[in-house]
Amino acid sequence: MIWIALVLWSTLLTSVVSQPEERLGNAVCEAISNAISPASDVFYFGGKLFFADIHHWAISSTQYPACTVEPGTAEDVGIILGILSSTQTPFAVKGGGHASNPGFSSTTGVHIAMTRFSEVAYDSTSETAIIGSGLVWDDVYASLAPHGVNVVGGRVTGVGVAGFILGGGMRFSWLTNQYGLTIDTVVAYELVKPTGEVANVTENSDPDLFFALKGGLNNFGIVTRFTLRTFPQGQVWGGLITYTQNHLSEVNAATVKFSNDVTDPKAAIITTYNFLLGQPGVSQLLFYDGPTSPDGIFDDFLAIPHFTQDVKTRDFMSLVLASPSNATQNLRGVFNTVSLLGYSDTLIDAIFWGAKLSIDTGLFISYDVEPFRPNIFSVSDTHTESAYPPSRSAGLLPLNLYYAWSFDISDDVFHDAIRQSAAHLYNVAVGQGQSDIVGAAVYPNYAIFDTPVESMYGSNVARLKQIKASVDPDNVMALAGGFKI
């Protein structure tokens, strides 16, 4: 019922986004249109594809550009970058459009939509899949399912492939406990460098650039395709349970017990504490990579009286769709995060303090508690050094904070509130003895827009700057938004 209300409200808000401001002239857009091949197109304000190109999951991430460009080949991406560089035109690159930070994948300049990079090609001999950067994970899972294989990707519907991987591949997968971070399963990146050169970047061909692309976001060019390792995938068990606020203490206890006691790498959960118009509740996702779950792993959750329950044996795609995460699209929103080493009852109880900051005016607020095994940074047999995480000595667990609201007049209020909430939870964790999180890296894909790059990449920043200067001597990628090296 709460999700229906959100859908109706968010649909209403699609007409509230600001109208186009004074935009760039069409000269750059026309130059691009004249230079690219027939495989690519340029679109202007008013057209259906223009609006599809700029659409984001959070409307606060949408801006109105002078035009949108849908490149159809890597070579055309290079041509586009050349024109943008020579004219010093601000631009954005959008993959799936799930970024919440304003200006990270949107612009008032030239908006590059990677929509046409939509292939999924499975190679049974190498046990890899080539995946286009314009896809969302839903598309990938659906394409690989007939082959009985899967990749380590996003857990809920609507998440883009490109941002997920380039931001660290750690908005953890249901398969992370078994196979590691998504970035540790990347075999190759097809990258259009800022100079326009198209390169197939592997650990052997260019180890420094390969390192930088593993979590370094859009600082080194535009990735058009990823080659990922695949893994066998059969039926899974799990789904969504919702609980009302009178069972919060039981959910807290079950979550902490799971986090501390469960060692089966096939088992995973997300406990999401929701506040809809100030009313608390819990959305509980359960997952087991097999048709049935062993006794004892999820018993505590199943024993709690529920409001709704959809837990069963199903295919992997069905489980991904079980989470109603798209119900909050078309709202204004922001993520933030705290890196933790574990969860306790008192730490989870502290979540409610943060919610009270905006409980009277926030349309939707959520905190995702995501327990994983402590060896997640080293479980992959192919893991190598990466831009993120800068250290793999401890398996950090990123608590994901998400605030959603209706109108831009409240942006600063909610940005400040989510910062305060994250700071409070961090202080509680440190006070409980999690001293190793002091100075620990923040996960880029959850980080709020003004997070310093040093907080994400730590001691790797100096090396990343050297790589950036080498691959992008004219600093072309500084014309695009995002966390800048």
Regions inferred by a protein language model and the residue ranges of each:
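Soluble FAD-dependent oxygen oxidases
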Residues: 2-3, 9-485
